Amino acid sequence: MANEEDDPVIQEIDVYLAKSLAEKLYLFQYPVRPASMTYDDIPHLSAKIKPKQQKVELEMAIDTLNPNYCRSKGEQIALNVDGACADETSTYSSKLMDKQTFCSSQTTSNTARYAAALYRQGELHLTPLHGILQLRPSFSYLDKADAKHREREAANEAGDSSQDEAEEDVKQITVRFSRPESEQARQRRVQSYEFLQKKHAEEPWVHLHYYGMRDSRSEHERQYLLCQGSSGVENTELVKSPSEYLMMLMPPSPEEEKDKPVAPSNVLSMAQLRTLPLADQIKVLMKNVKVMPFANLMSLLGPSVDSVAVLRGIQKVAMLVQGNWVVKSDILYPKDSSSPHSGMPAEVLCRGRDFVMWKFTQSRWVVRKEVAAVTKLCAEDVKDFLEHMAVVRINKGWEFLLPYDLEFIKKHPDVVQRQHMLWSGIQAKLEKVYNLVKETMPKKPDGQSAPVGLVSGEQRVQTAKTKAQQNHAFLERELQRRKEQMRAATVLPSVQIKEEPLSEEEADGAELEAEEEEPMDTAPSTCLSTKLANGLPAGRAVGGDSLNGHPVPGCASNPVACELKAFVEATFQRQFVLTLSELKRLFNLHLAGLPPGHILFSGVSDRMLQDTVLAAGCKQILVPFPPQTAASPDEQKVFALWESGDMSDQHRQVLLEIFSKNYRVRRNLIQSRLTQECGEELSKQEVDKVLKDCCVSCGGMWYLKGTVQS
């Protein structure tokens, strides 16, 4: 009551809403002039509007008789814009800048909160505004002057060239046919600035008649600002409760609603989370946390949430691993996504991450190199998989992030059994894709009914010592066999040693040893000393059956060898020079893009890959690396395509012979050697092509591809 007495009602005013000009009333603002300097008394020559864009242009006269007007400058501007000859299209017909154009710009797109008010005879009449425009002077005449200047220069140049040339040269015209436009391309085109400008230009101008403030037509139109209805029945918009009237008078601004503090992408607002459906809450939580026990999930969702509904929802977005829930791979890697590290598609990433999750269902520990060797993915992708659900331990590997949740396993045996069936299906798929041998795979625990036993570091060391002692005799025999091979290979280079044919059992055993000797791996090979110049085993090189350019025996009848040879030939036709390390990397990328169950997944050893390279018409280049080089053995094996069938074969062969004696060479030496061998001086383009095919430049020197050490 005290507040009401201090703030008494002075007067009550009736408010009316006028609608006659609701869709036609604009507010013009002139921000470059103070309010005291209006344009009311200045003659308005023309006016036009684009209603859809709410764009207005006004032409106002300039007082050329004013003592402040610079007549010489006005004549110069008119001359620059229209030129010396005046016609109907001239901007300034009087050859003097006697008018000025004003262009509008929108101050706000939301004018629903603004109205024009007229107070008369104790009544307040409101008319909603259709637009609020700010008009500023336009300097488009300067653009016209620049265009005229360019036209005059072009005409002068054309006149000079026409005197020099008797007839115009024939010009080549390129004809292009547009392909069908995709939906994404159409959306990008529609949202482009060029398209919007073209669309705005297509709307025609509507020419208007301007009437001054004191004109009788203006007085007549001003009457429409008053509400025409005499009774209050027609103004039902204002017959509202106080709260509804206040909401109509001051509606919440959309800009204010959107202007909320935005948290970082890795921070989840629990207040916003509560507004989502339960299934979306579970999905958002698992996508952010990656790994979570069921008890923690229930505590985040709140005490009022039904655990049965949560169990039903969690199984749609996560898998059970050691009693804990791990988000599914397809949630993290949607269908159209790819790896930021290697560019691998989402399907390959999901398959690799499922393999990591499956490995953790078998053991608490996972070794990253083993995962990379099976999945053929780069180290960064595998590290991302492991960081989602594990923590690294020095000299041990990656350990699962959370302890085994035995309580959940005992409390929900039906869920555990269902998850066990799902993992069985995933295991079968992984066996088929990665060609895993079932006999060597660890047996899955029945329903994950008990925690996986932990093995201490001392036990692991003791187990390794025991296995080493058991294999000691086998290793001794293997060492003796290799010594004999080396001794036989170095007896006499010209002596051919006769080899007795093996029985079928011995041949199978030898072939198995050869495949186990050099598995396809990203680690550097330690058996370089057992290879000859071209990367072949000592026993086979002595026989001379697989030297440079000769086919691999059995390639025609071996589909794996044929597929491998096709890959090698296609790769060297593009690259010309490759190290063994780079070739293995490209082969792993090729495997990752093949469909599941492809024949190349059966296993390709380093020896088989090198034999195929030599059989495809390539040769090994014995690059003399410096003694202090940090290159691995695989990086020191350099192979090059000897003959590709084009005109540059001879040039490339000369270049490769140069690098068989030099680790790095200057360009002038290469060019002089090419000129000497070919009998004629090669053009710069021909030398550049040969260098681009086989070499890279670093510090003013040229190296074979893959041999530059950072």
UniProtKB/Swiss-Prot annotation:
Residues bearing the modification Phosphotyrosine: Y224
Region (Disordered): 146-169, 498-526
Annotated Acidic residues bias: 502-520
Keyword presence, Phosphoprotein: yes
Residue(s) of cross-link: Glycyl lysine isopeptide (Lys-Gly) (interchain with G-Cter in SUMO2): K171, K432, K498, K661
Sequence segments annotated as region (Required for Pol III complex stability): 558-710
Pfam families in UniProt: RPC5, RPC5_C
Cross-link Glycyl lysine isopeptide (Lys-Gly) (interchain with G-Cter in SUMO1) residue location(s): K498
Keywords per UniProt: Antiviral defense, DNA-directed RNA polymerase, Immunity, Innate immunity, Isopeptide bond, Nucleus, Phosphoprotein, Transcription, Ubl conjugation
Keyword Phosphoprotein: yes
InterPro entries linked to this entry: RNA_pol_III_Rpc5 (IPR006886), RPC5_C (IPR045576)
Primary localization: nucleus
Gene Ontology cellular component annotations, sorted alphabetically: nucleoplasm; RNA polymerase III complex
Phosphoserine modification, residue list: S161, S162, S192, S503
Localization (cell): Nucleus
GO biological process, one term: innate immune response
Basic and acidic residues compositional bias, start-end: 146-155
Subunit structure: Component of the RNA polymerase III complex consisting of at least 17 subunits: a ten-subunit horseshoe-shaped catalytic core composed of POLR3A/RPC1, POLR3B/RPC2, POLR1C/RPAC1, POLR1D/RPAC2, POLR3K/RPC10, POLR2E/RPABC1, POLR2F/RPABC2, POLR2H/RPABC3, POLR2K/RPABC4 and POLR2L/RPABC5; the stalk composed of two subunits POLR3H/RPC8 and CRCP/RPC9, forming a structural mobile part that protrudes out of the core and functions primarily in transcription initiation; and additional subunits homologous to general transcription factors of the RNA polymerase II machinery, POLR3D/RPC4-POLR3E/RPC5 heterodimer and POLR3/CRPC3-POLR3F/RPC6-POLR3G/RPC7 heterotrimer.
PANTHER family (alphabetical): DNA-DIRECTED RNA POLYMERASE III SUBUNIT RPC5, DNA-DIRECTED RNA POLYMERASES III 80 KDA POLYPEPTIDE RNA POLYMERASE III SUBUNIT 5
Function (record text): DNA-dependent RNA polymerase catalyzes the transcription of DNA into RNA using the four ribonucleoside triphosphates as substrates. Specific peripheric component of RNA polymerase III (Pol III) which synthesizes small non-coding RNAs including 5S rRNA, snRNAs, tRNAs and miRNAs from at least 500 distinct genomic loci. Assembles with POLR3D/RPC4 forming a subcomplex that binds the Pol III core. Enables recruitment of Pol III at transcription initiation site and drives transcription initiation from both type 2 and type 3 DNA promoters.
Name under which the protein is recorded: DNA-directed RNA polymerase III subunit RPC5
Organism the protein comes from: Mus musculus
Designated gene of the protein: Polr3e
